[in-house]
From Swiss-Prot:
Known cofactor(s): [4Fe-4S] cluster
UniProtKB keywords: 4Fe-4S, Cytoplasm, Iron, Iron-sulfur, Metal-binding, S-adenosyl-L-methionine, Transferase
Subcellular location: Cytoplasm
PROSITE patterns registered for this protein in UniProt: RADICAL_SAM
Single GO cellular component term: cytoplasm
Gene: lipA
Record's protein name: Lipoyl synthase
Amino acid sequence: MSKPIQIERGVKYRDADKMALIPVRTVVTERQELLRKPEWMKIKLPADSSRIQGIKAAMRKNGLHSVCEEASCPNLAECFNHGTATFMILGAICTRRCPFCDVAHGRPLTPDANEPEKLAQTIHDMGLRYVVITSVDRDDLRDGGAQHFADCISAIRRKNPHIRIETLVPDFRGRMDRALEILTATPPDVFNHNLENVPRVYRQVRPGANYEWSLKLLENFKNAHPDITTKSGLMVGLGETNAEIVEVMRDLRRHGVTMLTLGQYLQPSRHHLPVQRYVSPDEFDEMKAEAMAMGFTHAACGPFVRSSYHADLQAKGIEVK
C-alpha cells in the first residue's frame, strides 16, 4: 500500500498526485487507448504571440491568475490574442479534485486581500468592457469565497463604471444561503454556474458535488434577482448520451436558466478521465436547435465552446460555436 500524500499548504498537486487523492479512482490512459482527435478538433495557433505574452505578463505582474492557463483551456491562444481573459480569483489551488479538471488541488493559501484592487486596475489597464470572474472551490472558507467575489465586483465597478461583469461561481456547498445573501448587495450582470455533465455520471465526474444542489443554486439566485441572466454549461464526451444532455437542458429551463453552453471535453493528461466520444459539429447544431426551441435566449454549442468563450458576444446574443 502506497504512503498517502501529505498535503502541504500552498503546494499545487496535479495529474497523478491529484488523481491519487480522488475517492473515485481513474485508470491511467495508455497512448494506444486514446481516441484519435477528428479533424474538427485541430486548432491552428496564431502566428503572432505578442498579445498572448502581453496578457500573461500583466497577470504575473499583479499576481493574478486566469482560468485559461490554470485549466489548460484549448482556446487560450485565440482569446488572449483578442485581448480577453477569464480571471480566476481566490488563488490557483482548488479544495476539490475533479478528475476532468486540470486546475491544481491542495490546501490553498489565505485569500489575497489586495486582489480586488489589483484585479480592478488590471482590467482598467487592459481596457476591457466585459469581464468574466471565476474561482477555484474554497471549501475551507466559511462563505465559500462569496465575500471575496463581492469585494472584487465592487472594486471592478469603482474603477471601471461602464463594465459588465459575469461571475462563474462554485457551488458554495453547505453555504448557499450565506453566499447568496452576500452577493445580493453586489450582484453581477450575468450569474453563471456550470452543471458540467449529466447526473448519472456525477459521482465519477464531480465527486463532492451534487446535481440537485447546483440546480437549486441557479434557481435561488434567479428568484432573488429575476432581472439578472443566469447561465450554465456542460462538457460532453464523458459517457453521457445526447438524450441525457437534452434532459439536463430541460432541468435548466425549469430552474430559470436562459443561457447555455455546450462544449467538447478534452482530457488534460492521461491521468484524467478519458474522452469517451467526440461529438460532431452537426450534433452540436442539433443540440443548439433543441435549446432554442426550449426557450433559451442564447445557446453556444460547439466543439471548442467553453462557458466563458467569447462571453461578451454570448451576452449580446451573437452566435458563438
